[in-house]
């Protein structure tokens, strides 16, 4: 039977947090951010396995969190790579052979909802690839190299991409392998498919599905958690 797998990318160092502790290990309400993220997927009935990607020297820390909070479905903890795309590729190589849909999610994005996860799987089965996100609330400007505004795109045409980003496993693995061969650099996994002419369906995420990257995000995260509990 085919599986739905999730790769949790926890290999970042979180330089913008101005902390010696990686952002995924910082705490909200006395629990590490990674705990909340793992719990969302481990308790979701449509997720069959979790592959956690982290820094090699943080594998034991992750293992301790998994054991302490009795988190199920984590099949492997694998070391990350030099760049995020390398870490994702390592995760892709670590999922089960019978994986059909793979979700790729930021460890520092702990407020993903069950509906976002379920819709990602559903749209991937329908279209082959899907990513959640939101329309920007603010007006976006395009500026030139001298710093002057030159255009104002329609907000309805813009989309702030979040995670999970969800894919047919064979499609995303094939595109990542081509990316390595051609030595291309990307900032997220939708770009991996775009590089090879593949379409990604964009569906509604949540403004609460934030990625915690700055000290201000930690404060906002506490407020979001209070509303959710």
Swiss-Prot record:
Gene Ontology CC: cytosol
Cited InterPro entries: IspD, IspD/TarI, IspD/TarI_cytidylyltransf_bact, ISPD_synthase_CS, Nucleotide-diphossugar_trans
EC numbers: 2.7.7.60
> What are the site positions for Positions MEP for the nucleophilic attack?
155, 211
Site described as Transition state stabilizer, located at 16, 23
Which reaction is catalysed here?
A: 2-C-methyl-D-erythritol 4-phosphate + CTP + H(+) = 4-CDP-2-C-methyl-D-erythritol + diphosphate
User: What is the stated purpose of this protein?
Assistant: Catalyzes the formation of 4-diphosphocytidyl-2-C-methyl-D-erythritol from CTP and 2-C-methyl-D-erythritol 4-phosphate (MEP).
NCBIfam families in the cross-refs = ispD, PRK00155.1-3
User: Which PANTHER family does its entry note?
Assistant: 2-C-METHYL-D-ERYTHRITOL 4-PHOSPHATE CYTIDYLYLTRANSFERASE, CHLOROPLASTIC (PTHR32125:SF4)
Protein name from the UniProt record: 2-C-methyl-D-erythritol 4-phosphate cytidylyltransferase
